[in-house]
Design a protein with these regions (language model features):
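Conserved N-terminal structural module of periplasmic/extracytoplasmic solute-binding proteins
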Residues: 1-16, 26-31, 164, 177, ...
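Hinge/lid segment of periplasmic solute-binding proteins
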Residues: 6-60, 198, 267-270
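Short helix-initiation/N-cap motifs at beta->coil->alpha
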Residues: 7, 81-87, 159-172
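Ligand-binding "clamshell"
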Residues: 12-20, 50, 99, 118, ...
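Short helices/loops that flank or line small-molecule/ion binding pockets
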Residues: 15, 69-70, 88-95, 166-178, ...
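Extracytoplasmic/periplasmic substrate-recognition and gating elements
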Residues: 73, 150-151, 155, 192-256
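Glycine-centered hinge/linker elements that transmit conformational signals in sensory
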Residues: 89-91, 130-162
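Long, aromatic- and glycine/proline-rich binding clefts that accommodate carbohydrate-like moieties
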Residues: 251-299, 303, 310
Length: 337
């Protein structure tokens, strides 16, 4: 058994190194597949219908805001339904305190990819033959981020540094009253002071509903294991993903439970009364998107990484950066199709 992200688990499955878990599920009359959040469960299937992985827990990027900054600027977090609402809030925060960043997206492509998905954008055409990362939905979102950071100066990013240095600098700004909020991982909750910050879901874009990615961390069953070992692995998968264990995991780590009924566990219900932020990732994941597989082995994501730096750090136009990324990504896709 191993705990892996989706790309690595799928790669092992493509090499026939992990077993199909479906026969174990089919033979288990007590198994309740419908209680698993669909966005996490469905990431375990390949295109041939093989169930190559079980979701162990999930992660999704949510919004953390500085309670005092919002209050001082007269902002009600419940009123932020769109990225345009967040833009207006960031402007108010900057007007109230010119030394404070209105909002800090996390450096890199993923926050902007989430916003694109919430704008109705896609990575591929429906037939999977064309990369669509320079469509109007993409350009609109990425150009807005460029404008907010470089022209309006209502947002900022931390970039570079050693390892996760940029991530913790972003968090520190919000905790030190230097930023109105930031976009970060559900797993950040263990590092945050919720007397100073609160959590909310990512908003939609314009008239489009919120649809950020929700990623599963997966448990796989190794193909060469004995029948007895495989049965034991299946039992552990069920045990780890029981509502009670999912509740404990979520409360202690901030990561997202993969079972809907986790919300009915008494300890979790009591916990979320005092820690409402723990419910935000679970609620967001219920309408989250599955990040599509990059069939090029990562070259499409690499092209977007370069484009994100050009937009966020260098201030290049989104159209220019995404047109270049589109060309690179399409060539990579054509080479494997």
């Amino acid at each position: 058994m191993a705990l892996l992200d989706v790309d690595k688990a799928r790669n092992l499955s493509n090499k026939d190194l992990v077993a199909d878990i479906q026969p174990y599920v089919d033979a288990d009359s007590d198994f309740d597949k419908d209680d698993y959040l669909q966005v996490f469960w469905n990431q375990g299937y390949d295109t041939n219908g093989k169930l190559f992985a079980f979701p162990a827990y999930g992660t999704t990027q949510i919004m953390y805001y500085n309670i005092k900054a919002f209050k001082d600027a007269g902002i009600n977090a419940d009123d932020i339904r769109t990225w345009q609402d967040l833009e207006a809030a960031a402007k108010k925060i900057r007007e109230k305190n010119p030394d404070m960043a209105g909002w800090e997206p996390m450096w890199g492509k993923w926050n902007m990819v989430d916003a694109v998905l919430s704008n109705g954008g896609k990575v591929f055409s429906d037939d999977g033959k064309t990369v669509t990362i320079n469509s109007k939905e993409w350009v609109e979102v990425w150009e807005s981020f460029r404008k907010w950071i470089h022209d309006d100066k209502i947002m900022k990013i931390h970039s570079g540094g050693q390892g996760w240095e940029y991530w913790y600098k972003t968090i520190d700004d919000v905790l030190a009253d230097k930023a109105g909020g930031y976009t970060g991982s559900s797993g950040d909750q263990a590092d945050l002071d919720f007397t100073k910050v609160a959590a909310m879901e990512q908003p939609g874009w314009g008239s489009n509903a919120s649809a950020p990615t929700a990623d599963a961390l997966q448990l796989v069953m190794l193909q060469n294991s004995s029948d007895e070992e495989k049965q034991g692995v299946y039992e552990f998968m069920k045990y780890f993903t029981s509502p009670e264990n999912q509740a404990n995991w979520s409360m202690n780590t901030g990561y997202v439970a993969v079972r809907n009924s986790t919300q009915k566990v008494d300890s979790f219900k009591e916990y979320t009364k005092d820690h409402p932020q723990a419910l935000v990732p679970l609620q967001q994941a219920s309408h989250g998107s599955i990040l599509p597989e990059d069939p090029t082995g990562g070259k499409i994501w690499d092209a977007l990484t370069v484009a994100a730096d050009e937009v966020e750090i260098e201030g290049k136009s989104a159209q220019e950066a995404l047109d270049k990324a589109q060309k690179t990504a399409q060539e990579a896709l054509d080479a494997v199709k």
